[in-house]
Amino acid sequence: MLEEIVQLFFAETPELLARIQTAIAHGDGRALERAAHSLKGTVMSFGAQMAGATALRLEVIGRSSDLTQAALVGAELEREVAHLGHALAVFKGEPVA
């Protein structure tokens, strides 16, 4: 079961991050809110508190429609998700760089 959830993380997360970046680039607060909310649920399923909190910040930014901090928080979220991805790759026994 856990392995399936890990596979789902690797399958869905790149698309969610791309949707977040597109929403930020287009100034689409509603799309940012939805994508950040989805990613928050994904990362929190692994107990990734920092990534979850950062996704929540983006969700709130999207809801407010004041996207002035969105790019900065989006970059922070990408770093947090990369850390989680690294940890999950190690868990799966995959070689990591």
Model-inferred region functions:
Residues 1-38, 42-45, 64, 68-96:
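Long, amphipathic alpha-helical coiled-coil segments characteristic
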Residues 54-63:
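Hydrophobic, amphipathic alpha-helical faces that serve as interaction scaffolds
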